UniProtKB/Swiss-Prot annotation:
It comes from the Eukaryota. Residues 147-460 form the NB-ARC domain. ATP binds at residues 190-197. Keywords: ATP-binding, Coiled coil, Leucine-rich repeat, Nucleotide-binding, Plant defense, Repeat. LRR repeats lie at residues 602-627, 649-674, 675-699, 768-791, 792-819, 841-865, 937-962. This is Probable disease resistance protein RF45. CDD domains: RX-CC_like. InterPro entries: Apaf_helical, LRR_dom_sf, LRR_R13L4/SHOC2-like, NB-ARC, P-loop_NTPase, RX-like_CC, Rx_N, WH-like_DNA-bd_sf. The keyword ATP-binding applies. Residues 25-52 form a coiled coil. PANTHER family: DISEASE RESISTANCE PROTEIN RGA3 (PTHR36766:SF40), PLANT BROAD-SPECTRUM MILDEW RESISTANCE PROTEIN RPW8 (PTHR36766). Belongs to the disease resistance NB-LRR family. It holds the Pfam family LRR_14.
Amino acid sequence: MAGELISFGIQNLWNLLSQECELFQGVEDQVTELKRDLNMLSSFLKDANAKKHTSAVVKNCVEEIKEIIYDGEDTIETFVLEQNLGKTSGIKKSIRRLACIIPDRRRYALGIGGLSNRISKVIRDMQSFGVQQAIVDGGYKQPQGDKQREMRQKFSKDDDSDFVGLEANVKKLVGYLVDEANVQVVSITGMGGLGKTTLAKQVFNHEDVKHQFDGLSWVCVSQDFTRMNVWQKILRDLKPKEEEKKIMEMTQDTLQGELIRLLETSKSLIVLDDIWEKEDWELIKPIFPPTKGWKVLLTSRNESVAMRRNTSYINFKPECLTTEDSWTLFQRIALPMKDAAEFKIDEEKEELGKLMIKHCGGLPLAIRVLGGMLAEKYTSHDWRRLSENIGSHLVGGRTNFNDDNNNTCNNVLSLSFEELPSYLKHCFLYLAHFPEDYEIKVENLSYYWAAEGIFQPRHYDGETIRDVGDVYIEELVRRNMVISERDVKTSRFETCHLHDMMREVCLLKAKEENFLQITSSRPSTANLQSTVTSRRFVYQYPTTLHVEKDINNPKLRALVVVTLGSWNLAGSSFTRLELLRVLDLIEVKIKGGKLASCIGKLIHLRYLSLEYAEVTHIPYSLGNLKLLIYLNLASFGRSTFVPNVLMGMQELRYLALPSDMGRKTKLELSNLVKLETLENFSTENSSLEDLCGMVRLSTLNIKLIEETSLETLAASIGGLKYLEKLEIYDHGSEMRTKEAGIVFDFVHLKRLWLKLYMPRLSTEQHFPSHLTTLYLESCRLEEDPMPILEKLLQLKELELGFESFSGKKMVCSSGGFPQLQRLSLLKLEEWEDWKVEESSMPLLRTLDIQVCRKLKQLPDEHLPSHLTSISLFFCCLEKDPLPTLGRLVYLKELQLGFRTFSGRIMVCSGGGFPQLQKLSIYRLEEWEEWIVEQGSMPFLHTLYIDDCPKLKKLPDGLQFIYSLKNLKISERWKERLSEGGEEYYKVQHIPSVEFYHRVLHIFRSVGGDITGRLLMR
């Protein structure tokens, strides 16, 4: 494996040496000799890599080669950079440079010559230990095996493919939680990769479990957990979102008290995923009171975590898959076409496949990974070769798995790493930077990879860095080495993470290759670390980092901080780290707020992030960083001075500016023609004309001020044909123009945010036809926008937010909005009348109407029939909405709250709400009577009623809803509904009836993410 990684490094160094000849004037002979030596060196690598496992000396040679390659890249790149910097210097600097040119070139000539000498020595050493040379004609060639492995995989990932043979386990676990009242804690234990988390997720999402419990919480505990973090997460899950800030400010004692009170009075299921030690469980469990309304489901590799000698504790140990189930799972992944009518598996492949899965020992993860490797192997010869490799990797032919020895699984999973193309090996190893269970942002990861030169030039071909990153992540996902799912809105992989066992492999390989050093302020740090000579340094969860004291490696290429909050940077001198390519200081606090000017000496830097940093002053020396492709200065809540030095960073692909730079800051950005993402661009600090040449932009966020007209904006961004996401926020005058004044003629635009005064939409041509997401706010549209918007055939999500529409009537026409799935109508204060024609919005699933106080009634007919979730708040409906909503045969969740209905009587008719499962009614202050006819709501399992002061009795029809499992209602009903009470007969069949002393805070907008964003603006 090291040989392929080195081959990748040689390729990069070869590319550096193959630049324009004029760059190497004065050192031409040394460069030519170095290229010849590299060509010679590459011919020894294959055999050296094969022999390094049996020869410590050869292994040392391979390690020395890696160091030579790194040093070579540093030397050549520094020489080229200094040449280019000299060309762009002023006259005085050029004169000084000419005076130093001879000694400088002599120094580099000696340095390059030294590299050749080191290569010659390592070749002699390898030859003396029997390493054979393979003849390579011409220039450096990538190994043929790489080219074969780089073919795109042809199998598709089945989302349920790992759920094989586990149905009986799910049924048994659900039974423990739902049917056995004496059981309090159920632990699922077994080795990593057994499918414990998959099993727990199936149970967590099971309908019977959802019916049984009022509150559900899922917590990933991990090795580095703190008790406060776990308790806070549980309370956030069980409490409404609006209390999150209050929860985060609680002391530990207050937090414990709140949780105890909550768990004493409600039925809650808490899932604690991946607890490592018995002591961890002992730290967490003080929040659980003796009252037995709560239950815990936990997963662990350690059986002793929650072992007790009483019947309230159950330890469940899933067995490995049977041979038959293993074969079924393997076929789903390795042979995705097996269900096609014409498909017939080759007999030899079947024999080899069944032989290979024996090495997996029934472990689902190992089977998935093995299947992922074989899915791209089309011939029996390929399968036979891999079968032989698996046998050679297994020690002593072990096939049994246990918690004491995971070598077999590691070998199988490691083989999936060996099968990766060399560039994907680098991509995979980079994931070792991140802590356990960490959700990695794919966009950031893509720029890390690009900054380190991992991307192959042939993969660019006009693509953005994010596009290339998506291709790489997709390959890793398809090989089941990385876990990720495409985001519904963007169709991209937005985040990813590693399975525990695959992370172990990643850390192991990173250690073998001395790929990075990990330091953590957490009590339990990464269990596999490299030495301090690593070229990459990762600090996880620091409180303080002292650069001069904590980092003592002048050859460092990457310094990355992973954190969940702010931290202090002490001794902010980077003078000894001049070879850095990646510097990520997210959420850093710098004393005095001024970034040190020595940052300008990091001329190799490609990636610099000061996102959310407490920095008030960026130095002028930042302009020296000509190679930057990623610069993130985004900050909120404070003004940050940024000097006008960005125009020279012509390699920039990603630029995020501070949200507030003050009126005095003026930035020239017209040279940044390679930008793909530009965040927080403000016309207060830059000219709109600078945008004209940024034709590669795919994401643009603009803040307008008073002096800017929409016509000027339209002229400036009209040529940005590759825009996919556009946000425009108007912080200036409300009277820019009486017309829209801008045509969004972007054929690739999918997501559009507009917060600006735009009282009219003349035609649908204002919006591109491929738009999938549209948010409008503060537009003050005078005419109904629906006739225009409903013609957007690809629109899936629409929000008309605060003051977006000032008219009274909206009509959704027949056939309109053919793809719309979510509709949010928020704070439309003048809106009174809504008409929906038949066949409008046929795919609508979620409807959210909030603070539309003049809306008196819903459309009597033709509400989209496929609606599954509806939330109505502050709407003041005069007519009973239930007869209309009851006809929605797919509706599963309904929330009516906060004076939404101002009438007296509501009726649920017989046969109405045939699929409704959850009904929440609260704060209807005029509501007096509720009639539920027999046959209504046959599948209702959860009912909330609270703060409806004029409602005097519950409907008799409740006694016929036998599916009802949970009733939550305010304390004033306790006497009437308790045993012996006059209405007890209506609720005696309900397993759980709970009474509350205070108002239930159960508000949860179905469009919660949209509402949250609205409130943050």
